[in-house]
């Protein structure tokens, strides 16, 4: 569960290392985001030669959460960290590589490019 002020790792090579959730998109009273949800983030830590700079505001999709996610078959999946991938206005990833595993639920939410770039889909 990702809410406002939550800090997340960045799982791509856009140059950002850490981001902070500023807003959860999808309704005026929406408080928490889970895997596959789009959030507005502020870049808190970035590499010097990055595509994004510290202080920039961008959109990101959550790819891993520590909170358990229940699947339709009754199983649960959880990860060791909260991570997101920065995306542009057309929901394509800004980076060209994805680091670490991502959840299968991203494919159903039409983030096929992120799933295809990921080294492992759980």
UniProtKB/Swiss-Prot annotation:
Coiled-coil boundaries: none
Molecular function, one GO term: large ribosomal subunit rRNA binding
SUPFAM superfamilies: Ribosomal protein L14
One matching Pfam family: Ribosomal_L14
Domain of life: Bacteria
InterPro entries: Ribosomal_uL14, Ribosomal_uL14_bac-type, Ribosomal_uL14_CS, Ribosomal_uL14_sf
Known partners and oligomeric status: Part of the 50S ribosomal subunit. Forms a cluster with proteins L3 and L19. In the 70S ribosome, L14 and L19 interact and together make contacts with the 16S rRNA in bridges B5 and B8.
Role noted for this protein: Binds to 23S rRNA. Forms part of two intersubunit bridges in the 70S ribosome.
Protein name: Large ribosomal subunit protein uL14
Annotated organism of origin: Bdellovibrio bacteriovorus (strain ATCC 15356 / DSM 50701 / NCIMB 9529 / HD100)
Gene: rplN
